Amino acid sequence: MHNIFAKMKNIYYIYAMENIKLKIARIEKSLSQQELADLVKATRQTIGLIEKGKYNPTLSLCVRIARALNKTLNDLFWDED
């Protein structure tokens, strides 16, 4: 349980830096920001801001994005140091 809280804390790193992993995963799936947004019930603007590191998504949104891209949360959001 402690490990999940530590990882949840790390999710805030995407607020401070560009989330290139998310952008690459989206492009590999040949999805536009709008198409991904539609799949995860978000706006295109939200996806764009997450990719730029200017929006801190909820854990729920992170899970929906990861599922839509067939990736894990670790793959997209958590920096494994």
Task: Enumerate the predicted regions with their spans.
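Short, Lys/Arg-enriched C-terminal cap helix and immediately downstream tail that follows
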Residues: 24, 59-60
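Short, conserved catalytic or interaction motifs in soluble domains
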Residues: 52, 78-81
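Short basic helix-loop element that most often maps to the first helix and adjoining turn
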Residues: 20-39
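Recognition helix of helix-turn-helix/homeodomain-like DNA-binding domains
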Residues: 43-55
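N-terminal flexible/basic segments that precede or flank functional cores
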Residues: 1-17, 28
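DNA major-groove recognition helix of helix-turn-helix/homeodomain DNA-binding modules
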Residues: 60-75
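Residues in the helix-turn-helix
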Residues: 35, 46, 75
